[in-house]
């Protein structure tokens, strides 16, 4: 091969490489952390109050035993349910897209299920009426658009909340005993304690955070915690009347 031919071959190779799309190099994902814990109730648990649903026989017949209020629900081992736990400080400068999966608020037995719902701002909320009777769902926000919608059985209803707000009281204008709460966040780092008081904040970026626990009757508590990359830590809150 002559020098001229060799130069032509090298030029052709370089030209073909220059026409290739650039290779994208992805940096390895940062190891995330988790924060698990439990919320406890100190002292003798308050007795739940029986709900009188006699004004709507369709509501009353949905329960084999009398329905009770859910403002303070204490489970096994004094675990406190329906507490919202969330990152209230430490995420400055970060933005998060809402999940594609909608949150679901069900009206069942003429009560809101779950009693306390948490979702992300601009995440779709599917409101479901599983009862034979007609409901009127009416959130009363301070930082979001108020809406007040009559919903017969089976009629689909989709809503969203645009801004963070903890927490929005929800009532039903038809059934005055129906009460619940919706907590709206601008990030995905929140949880609602289960029937045993347990919660799990997953996939936290490493950092130092203020963690807040909110309960509708017992108020709020805060703690500060630092988690490293890939680290798992535990946290406990205790409420009392």
What is the role of each PLM region?
Residues 6-20:
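Bacterial N-terminal signal peptides
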Residues 1-5:
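Positively charged n-region of N-terminal signal peptides that target proteins for export
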Residues 25-241:
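Extracytoplasmic copper-binding redox domains, predominantly the cupredoxin/blue-copper superfamily
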């Amino acid at each position: 091969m002559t020098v001229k031919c060799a130069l032509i071959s090298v030029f052709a190779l370089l030209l073909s490489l220059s026409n290739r799309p650039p290779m994208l190099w992805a940096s390895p994902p940062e190891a995330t952390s988790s924060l698990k814990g439990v919320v406890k109730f100190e002292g003798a648990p308050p007795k739940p109050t029986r709900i009188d649903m006699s004004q709507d026989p369709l509501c009353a017949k949905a329960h084999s035993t009398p329905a009770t209020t859910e403002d303070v629900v204490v489970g096994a081992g004094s675990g406190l349910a329906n507490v919202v736990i969330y990152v209230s400080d430490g995420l400055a400068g970060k933005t998060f897209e809402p999940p594609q999966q909608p949150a679901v608020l069900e009206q069942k037995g003429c009560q809101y299920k779950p009693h306390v719902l948490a979702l992300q701002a601009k995440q779709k909320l599917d409101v479901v009426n599983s009862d034979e009777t007609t409901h009127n769902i009416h959130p009363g926000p301070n930082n979001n658009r108020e809406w007040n919608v009559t919903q017969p059985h089976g009629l689909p209803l989709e809503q969203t909340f645009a801004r963070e707000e903890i927490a929005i009281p929800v009532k039903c204008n038809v059934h005055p005993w129906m009460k619940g709460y919706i907590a709206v966040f601008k990030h995905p780092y929140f949880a609602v304690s289960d029937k045993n008081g347990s919660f799990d904040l997953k996939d936290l970026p490493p950092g130092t955070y203020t963690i807040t626990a909110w309960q509708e009757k017992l108020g709020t508590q805060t703690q500060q915690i630092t988690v490293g990359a890939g680290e798992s830590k535990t946290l406990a809150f205790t409420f009392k009347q």
